């Protein structure tokens, strides 16, 4: 079996050698070999050019792929940033709405406080007015008491359009009412009439 393989190789080698001799014996055989060599060199050069071009294309693709990857990462980063901005904007809107509601509540409380202060001021004024009225009434009462003790006359000051009052006789325990129409009497006549009533006591 080994001999058959060796014989086969030798036969192939001898056949290749015969073909080569025949090729060299041809008139233009050397030219064909030279032409084939030139074609081989040209093909080899073209292959190198194609290789270099493909290699450059691969590097260019790598560069573009890196740039695309970087842009993708930036895009994801921008998306994340946009999500964060949207979240912060939402929180800001919620805080602004909460602040607006608090301002409304504060305004209502301020209005209520203003009303309470106005009521308190009115109460204080009414209290002071009541105190003045009580004081004035007490003063008037004392004045009337003094008039009554001196003149035995208690004037009626509730109606300023007329002069009226009561004549008091403490000994007899009598009270007599008197009244003068100011539109029918002069001030002088009214004064004389009052003194006449007093002198009767």
UniProtKB/Swiss-Prot annotation:
<dbReference type="GO" id="GO:0051781">
    <property type="term" value="P:positive regulation of cell division"/>
</dbReference>
<keyword id="KW-0175">Coiled coil</keyword>
<dbReference type="GO" id="GO:0051301">
    <property type="term" value="P:cell division"/>
</dbReference>
<keyword id="KW-0132">Cell division</keyword>
<comment type="subunit">
    <text>Component of the NDC80 complex, which consists of NDC80, NUF2, SPC24 and SPC25.</text>
</comment>
<dbReference type="GO" id="GO:0005634">
    <property type="term" value="C:nucleus"/>
</dbReference>
<dbReference type="GO" id="GO:0009933">
    <property type="term" value="P:meristem structural organization"/>
</dbReference>
<dbReference type="GO" id="GO:0051983">
    <property type="term" value="P:regulation of chromosome segregation"/>
</dbReference>
<keyword id="KW-0498">Mitosis</keyword>
<dbReference type="InterPro" id="IPR044951">
    <property type="entry name" value="SPC24-like"/>
</dbReference>
<feature type="coiled-coil region">
    <location>
        <begin position="78"/>
        <end position="133"/>
    </location>
</feature>
<keyword id="KW-0131">Cell cycle</keyword>
<protein>
    <recommendedName>
        <fullName>Kinetochore protein SPC24 homolog</fullName>
    </recommendedName>
</protein>
<dbReference type="GO" id="GO:0000776">
    <property type="term" value="C:kinetochore"/>
</dbReference>
<keyword id="KW-0137">Centromere</keyword>
<comment type="similarity">
    <text>Belongs to the SPC24 family.</text>
</comment>
<dbReference type="GO" id="GO:0031262">
    <property type="term" value="C:Ndc80 complex"/>
</dbReference>
<keyword id="KW-0158">Chromosome</keyword>
<comment type="function">
    <text>Acts as a component of the essential kinetochore-associated NDC80 complex, which is required for chromosome segregation and spindle checkpoint activity to ensure proper cell division. Required for the maintenance of plant architecture.</text>
</comment>
């Amino acid at each position: 079996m080994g001999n058959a393989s060796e014989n086969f190789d030798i036969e192939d080698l001898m056949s290749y050698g015969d073909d080569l001799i025949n090729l060299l014996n041809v008139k233009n055989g050397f030219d064909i070999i030279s032409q084939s060599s030139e074609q081989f060199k040209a093909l080899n050069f073209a292959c190198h050019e194609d290789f270099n071009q493909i290699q450059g294309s691969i590097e260019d693709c790598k560069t573009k792929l890196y740039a695309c990857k970087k842009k993708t990462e930036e895009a994801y980063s921008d998306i994340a940033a946009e999500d964060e901005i949207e979240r912060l904007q939402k929180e800001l809107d919620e805080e602004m709405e909460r602040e607006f509601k608090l301002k409304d509540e504060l305004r209502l409380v301020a209005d209520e406080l203003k009303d309470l202060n106005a009521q308190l001021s009115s109460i204080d004024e009414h209290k002071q007015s009541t105190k003045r009225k009580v004081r004035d009434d007490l003063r008037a009462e004392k004045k009337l008491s003094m008039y009554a003790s001196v003149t035995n006359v208690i004037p009626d000051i509730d109606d300023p359009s007329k002069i009226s009052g009561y004549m008091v006789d403490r000994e007899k325990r009598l009270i007599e009412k008197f009244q003068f129409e100011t539109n029918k009497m002069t001030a002088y006549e009214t004064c004389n009439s009052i003194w006449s009533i007093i002198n009767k006591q």
